[in-house]
Amino acid sequence: MAKGKRDKIRMVSSAATGHFYTTDKNKKNTPGKMEMMKYDPVVRKHVMYKEGKIK
């Protein structure tokens, strides 16, 4: 079976709450690390989420 073009990634909160979102990204179009502002329900604010590996 062929390997897919998208990798599953984990978006980890920079607020150090341990909260994360899972998503996927296209390896070819976005080779660098993703960063985006998302809502962290633990601190009840929008914070920066950075890409991490799924274990």
UniProtKB/Swiss-Prot annotation:
The keyword Ribosomal protein appears for this protein: yes
This protein's UniProt keywords: Ribonucleoprotein, Ribosomal protein
PROSITE patterns xrefs: RIBOSOMAL_L33
InterPro entries: Ribosomal_bL33, Ribosomal_bL33_CS, Ribosomal_bL33_sf, Ribosomal_zn-bd
Molecular-function annotations in GO: structural constituent of ribosome
GO cellular component term of the entry, any: cytosolic large ribosomal subunit
One GO term of the biological process aspect: translation
One family name in Pfam for this protein: Ribosomal_L33
Keyword Ribosomal protein: yes
UniProt record similarity statement: Belongs to the bacterial ribosomal protein bL33 family.
NCBIfam families reported for this sequence: PRK00595.1, rpmG_bact
Protein name stated in the entry: Large ribosomal subunit protein bL33
Lineage summary: Bacteria, Pseudomonadati, Pseudomonadota, Gammaproteobacteria, Lysobacterales
Gene (UniProt): rpmG
